[in-house]
């Protein structure tokens, strides 16, 4: 039994039946930090969350470190797959990456080195069949934003997104779009293109709900190592913002039954 509960019970026995003492003791019980910690840990109990995405969820000290840890602390069962350079349709139609990295993490298990062999993302339908998630969280956007090119092919992005959302089917989903970066010649990411892509995705990802990554953080606040991939500190800030933005919806969805097999 937590020490705070034991102390509360002793105080109740010695306090008699006076109403003020009971009210004061109850207030102490409700604000005990140790007990609040137990309540927080149960916030997402019963929820199975499947996270998929590109390089932002592939490497140690990226969102692969932040999101599974934080959602597991809230009581969720979390399974995460990241494949560097993957686009939305790659999670439906097999398309090997260039060997820049792939990762799988169950819960908050230790993060090992990514698999650097060229590999296709596992099909989303097989992942749903395997893990029976209540919710799929998609972390994608940068790989489809055509950074360094004159324009985004919106028809192509539309096809990419619709291919994935159709395959996700009746399973609830949350799509997290790109956030800010820094310009570098390597990728050519600009705030203007990030804003354009984030806004376009908002109207594309239904029936998934959408989290605009550029709305979570202040423009110019994200530090990167190469223009796109954030520093560990900025990944922590971005990840924490994603958690806070999605917790209310995840809490509502935790009691929803997993979608039937398609």
From Swiss-Prot:
Select a single GO molecular function from the record's annotations and give it: hydrolase activity, acting on ester bonds
Which residue windows are coiled coil? none
Please report the organism this UniProt entry assigns to the protein: Komagataeibacter xylinus (Gluconacetobacter xylinus)
- What is the protein named? Protein BcsX
Is Chaperone tagged as a keyword?
no
Entry keywords, A to Z: Cellulose biosynthesis
**Source domain of life:** Bacteria
For this protein's source organism, the top of the classification is:
Bacteria, Pseudomonadati, Pseudomonadota, Alphaproteobacteria, Acetobacterales
The gene designation is bcsX
Q: Which pathway is this protein engaged in? A: Glycan metabolism; bacterial cellulose biosynthesis
What GO biological process terms are annotated to this protein in UniProt? cellulose biosynthetic process
């Amino acid at each position: 039994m937590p020490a705070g509960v034991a102390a509360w019970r002793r105080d109740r026995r010695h306090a008699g039946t006076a109403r003020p003492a009971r009210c004061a003791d109850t207030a102490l019980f409700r604000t005990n930090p140790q007990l609040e910690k137990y309540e927080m840990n149960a916030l997402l109990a019963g929820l199975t969350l499947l996270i998929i995405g590109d390089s932002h969820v592939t490497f140690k000290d990226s969102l692969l470190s932040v999101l599974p840890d934080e959602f597991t602390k809230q009581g969720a069962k979390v399974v995460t797959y990241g494949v560097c350079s993957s686009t939305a349709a790659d999670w439906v139609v097999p398309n090997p990456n260039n060997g820049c990295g792939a990762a799988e993490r169950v819960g908050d298990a230790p993060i090992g080195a990514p698999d650097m062999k060229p590999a296709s993302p596992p099909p989303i339908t097989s992942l749903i069949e395997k893990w029976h998630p209540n919710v799929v969280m998609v972390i994608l956007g940068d790989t489809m934003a055509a950074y360094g090119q004159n324009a985004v092919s919106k028809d192509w992005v539309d096809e990419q997104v619709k291919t994935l959302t159709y395959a996700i089917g009746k399973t609830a989903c949350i799509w997290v779009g790109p956030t800010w970066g820094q310009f570098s010649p390597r990728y050519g990411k600009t705030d203007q293109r990030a804003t354009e892509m984030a806004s376009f995705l908002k109207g594309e990802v239904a029936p998934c709900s959408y989290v605009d990554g550029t709305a979570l953080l202040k423009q110019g606040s994200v530090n990167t190592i190469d223009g796109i991939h954030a520093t560990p500190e900025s990944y922590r800030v971005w990840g924490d913002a994603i958690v806070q933005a999605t917790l209310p919806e995840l809490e509502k969805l935790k009691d929803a039954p997993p979608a039937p097999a398609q």
